[in-house]
Amino acid sequence: MARVTVEDCLHAVDNRFELVLVASKRAHQLAKGVSEPLVEVNNDKPTVLALREIAAGLVTKDILNQPDHHFATNSLDLALSGGQGF
């Protein structure tokens, strides 16, 4: 897919504002390595991957009901956070 538009994604998420929340949460998961991409990467950035996953129907607004993960998983993150997570 050469370009992803908002209209490509609106069949999976009803409104544009919710789409922003879904895409940003999924992009954050991808950027932090919480989960693997569900589409071919093609050298795309996490935000583009998130939108492509939404457009393909692989990610829905149900992602908003998932608990946020604390990303202090490596020793540097733990040291910087004082061992308490973020």
Curated annotation (Swiss-Prot):
Gene Ontology terms: biological process: DNA-templated transcription
Pfam families given in the database record: RNA_pol_Rpb6
EC number(s) on file: 2.7.7.6
Keywords: DNA-directed RNA polymerase, Nucleotidyltransferase, Transcription, Transferase
GO cellular component: DNA-directed RNA polymerase complex
Keyword Oxidoreductase among record annotations: no
Known catalytic reactions: RNA(n) + a ribonucleoside 5'-triphosphate = RNA(n+1) + diphosphate
Top EC category: transferase
UniProt-listed Gene3D superfamilies: 3.90.940.10
UniProt-recorded Gene Ontology molecular function terms: DNA binding; DNA-directed RNA polymerase activity
Annotated disulfide bonds: none
InterPro entries: DNA-dir_RNA_pol_omega, Pol_omega/Rpo6/RPB6, RPB6/omega-like_sf
Domain of life, source organism: Bacteria
Subunit comment: The RNAP catalytic core consists of 2 alpha, 1 beta, 1 beta' and 1 omega subunit. When a sigma factor is associated with the core the holoenzyme is formed, which can initiate transcription.
The family this protein is said to belong to: Belongs to the RNA polymerase subunit omega family.
HAMAP family: RNApol_bact_RpoZ
Physiological role: Promotes RNA polymerase assembly. Latches the N- and C-terminal regions of the beta' subunit thereby facilitating its interaction with the beta and alpha subunits.
Name of this chain's protein: DNA-directed RNA polymerase subunit omega
Organism annotation: Psychrobacter sp. (strain PRwf-1)
Gene name for this UniProt entry: rpoZ
